[in-house]
Amino acid sequence: MFVDQVTISLKAGDGGNGITAYRREKYVPFGGPAGGDGGKGASVVFEVDEGLRTLLDFRYQRHFKAKKGENGQSSNMHGRGADDLVLKVPPGTIIKSVETDEVLADLVEDGQRAVVARGGRGGRGNSRFATPRNPAPDFSENGEPGEELDVTLELKLLADVGLVGFPSVGKSTLLSIVSKAKPKIGAYHFTTIKPNLGVVSTPDNRSFVMADLPGLIEGASDGVGLGHQFLRHVERTKVIVHMIDMSGSEGRDPFDDYQIINKELVNYKQRLEDRPQIVVANKMDMPDAQDNLTLFKEQVDDSVTIIPVSTITRDNIEQLLYAIADKLDEVKDIDFSVDNDEEIGVNRVLYKHTPSQDKFTITRDDDGAYVVSGNAIERMFKMTDFNSDPAVRRFARQMRSMGIDDALRERGCSNGDIVRILGGEFEFVE
C-alpha cells in the first residue's frame, strides 16, 4: 500500500527532576547541598532511510512519545539522559506543523536528520542554587517538559523521470515494459491511483528511476480529481515524460491534451514548466495515429522532443529510453528547496528548530480571575516544585522579575484577587 501523506502526534521526553539532598558523611560537619540534576528528555528525530518508499508505517501508529530523562540522585549524581526517539522516513519527506503550516524539515538525502520535537532539559538539583547568602538551599527544580506538537508528513517522490498525461494513455504499460514494476493496468480511467516507481536500465548500462503518476485532468492544478496529491510527486522529477494518446481513441485531440496538461503544470506554480520535457506519442499502432502525429508536429514548437512509440507492439521503446537517459545527462542538479519569495509562515523552511520564548499575556475569566499565559511563564510553572515553600518563593520572585506583578496591577488586580496559570490558582498579595 502506498501512503504519501499522514498526520501524527509527537511528544518529546520530559527532563528528569533535580532533587534536594545533602552530604551526610561522617566527619563532614558542613556537608552542604548534594542534589544532582535530572537527565535530558529524549527528542523526536526524523531520519531518512533510502530503503523506504512510503509512509505506511505511520498509518497504523499515529502517536509517538519519547522517554523521560532520569531524576537526579544524591551525592551530586546526575540522572541519565534518555536516548532520542528516531523515526525513519523515505527520501523526499516534508514535515509540516499542523498548527502553523510551517515547513519544519525537508529531508532528501540518505541519513539526513532533523530534530522536530526537542526533549526537555533536566531540572537542577539544590546544589546548583547554592550562593554565599544561601549556602544550603532546600529546593530543587523539576524537569522541563518536552515539546508536544502535531505534524503532517508529506512525501514527494524523488524520481529522475515522471510520467504525466491524461488517464489511459499508456503510462503504466510503459513502466511495466521498461522496468520490473508491476503497476495495475486496466481498460478504464484512473486504474492508477497511487504513484508507482521502477528502476529503468538502458542497453548501454545507464539507469534511472521512473515514476508512473496517476492520470491528470483539466483543473488538476486547482485540486480537481485529487490533482494536488498527484502533481506533488512531479515537483522533484528532473525530466517530465509527457505521454499522449496520438490515436485520439478517447475522442480527444492530441494537441488539446498537450496544451491542457502543460497548462496545469504551469498553474501549479512549482516551476514545473521549466523542467526538460519529452513528448511520447503513444498508440502509433492505431488508425489515424500517423496523420495525427504529422499534424501535431506542425502545431508544436520545433524545440519539442517527440518520440513516437507503441507500448503494445513495443516499437521505438529503446529509442525512448536512450532519449530520456541523454536528457538526464544534460540536466544539472535542480534546487528543490522552497522559493525564497514564498509567503513567510506558509512555505518557509526552518533549518533549525528552536523553542519560541514569547512574552506573557493577561486575560480575564468569566468569574473575574486573571489568567496569565505565555511560553516562558508556563515553562517555569511546570518546572517548579510547589510542594516546597522555598521553590514557591523562588517562583514568585521570577514572576516579579518578568514584570508580571506590575502588569497585573496595571490591569486592576488587587490584594486577594485570583490569578491562574495553567490551571493553578494563586492569591495576589501586595
Curated annotation (Swiss-Prot):
- Keyword Metal-binding listed? The answer is yes
OCT domain ranges (all copies): 352-430
Q: What is its main location?
A: cytoplasm
The alphabetized UniProt keywords are: Cytoplasm, GTP-binding, Hydrolase, Magnesium, Metal-binding, Nucleotide-binding
- What EC identifiers does the entry list? 3.6.5.-
Residues holding Mg(2+): S172, T192
Q: Where does the record place it?
A: Cytoplasm
BP term (GO), one: ribosome biogenesis
Quote the function comment for this protein: An essential GTPase which binds GTP, GDP and possibly (p)ppGpp with moderate affinity, with high nucleotide exchange rates and a fairly low GTP hydrolysis rate. Plays a role in control of the cell cycle, stress response, ribosome biogenesis and in those bacteria that undergo differentiation, in morphogenesis control.
Question: Matching NCBIfam families, A to Z?
Answer: Obg_CgtA, Obg_CgtA_exten, PRK12296.1, PRK12297.1, PRK12299.1
Its assembly, as annotated, is:
Monomer.
Name-wise, this protein is: GTPase Obg
